[in-house]
Amino acid sequence: MRRKFLINILFLLTVSILVKAFWVLGIDRTVQNVVGEAAYGSYFSLFSFSVLFTLLLDMGLSGFNNRAVAADPTRVKLYFGNVLLLRLMLTAAYFIVTLSVAFALGYRKWQVSMLLILMLNQVMASMILWLRSNISGMQYLLLDSLLSVADRLIMILVCGVLLWGGIAGDGFRIEWFIWSQTVAYLTVMCISLAIVVRRGGVARVRPDADVLKNIIVNGLPYAAVVFAMTVYWRIDSVLIERLLPEGATAAGNYAQGFRLFDALSMIPVMFGGMLLPIMTRGLSSGSDITPLAKMAARMLLAPLGVGAVTLATFPGEVLDLLYISPGAGAVDSFRLLMFTIVPVGVIYIYSTMLTAAWKLRILGIITLSGMLLNVVLNLVLIPWLGIAGAACTALITQTLVAVACMIAVRKTMTGIAGKGRIFKYIMMLSLIFLAGWILRRTGISWMAAAALQLGAGIALALLFRFTEPLKSLRLITDQDSSHRSQAKD
């Protein structure tokens, strides 16, 4: 299990970092600089609003399907037609509910028009997620990794031509950015569908009432978790746009810091997506997933912590590098969001363990509590602190959810890290931040200071044994280990 995970996650990280880094820094950032804060802020708020009700598109079906197929790949043929029928019905519900709320909130005609395209994109993105859950469940992990970045590759090509191809005579429009996403999602959805039909042996679509009932009942716990996490992940920008004066501009300023946070958060998401089918297959065969979880935690949390603390030390300099004119409050919110990356990483390790072990009732209670806390804190802190209040809320919510997930895993399954290990990790992050604080005051350039801080962070991670590259290399090259792993899998 560990060798399979290590090889696949290294491939996924390499591909994703190359593609998504160019997307965030080359395309997304350029679009915001070109169209301006108000236009991008309106898009960002509407995009976040379109995400809020995506629970209705999935209702936990992708998570349930991934776990079910990973345990028994032949279930692809059994579930495919039934899930497809459910998704079509859920799509209608998603459009009705989202548009009803949009009209109730007083969205204007041009906002609704833009929202409709964004909603179509969410439908296709959700469909891709479900199709990929079949592919990863069947253990085609490298293929799933390629599909995970295929949409961004297509968006880069389309937006690159529009931005730098000399065909946008009157300037780039935010609507083109949205339509490029539509083209990308449609292409990847068709490719993913063809793969699932062929590799899964799906000959025809034949819904079955009993199977439908089983899917709905078992998918509801996933739905509660997905809904709660979606709300406390995306509600902030919607509330910023609604609660603050010049809300669209404020949402655009918040997006400046949130963009990098969202991009870095994809790393824990990738870890969770890769871990779930492997852990599920391991548990179904009676294997111990603790060694895999410990290795994944070391691989994720050490570099994530080092990078996040370094970025949080130089927030103004990083935003100045990325944007023509960082907005008011963007620096403070960016610093807080970078610190938030660490508990996000913890959540995706521990929540994946709970999901693989079918501890969804506990996970649902944790995430729903986090959602309620997040909404209340946002309503209080955004009017008081502005966009920094939303970032502060994110830090508090994610930290408490992370702690709750750790406690739940320790009490119901097994412990990954003891109190001493946790204390060492916090001490390592504190020392890295202290090193950066000192380096800022030496008078050297901020890039040199950041590079030295990163070096100090890597040295501390090695010293505290939070990363062990030689051990990982031996695991990859040890063929005997590979054979033993395959025998267990």
What are these regions (language model features)?
Residues M1-V24, K77, G81, A209-V225, ...:
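N-terminal membrane topogenesis motif
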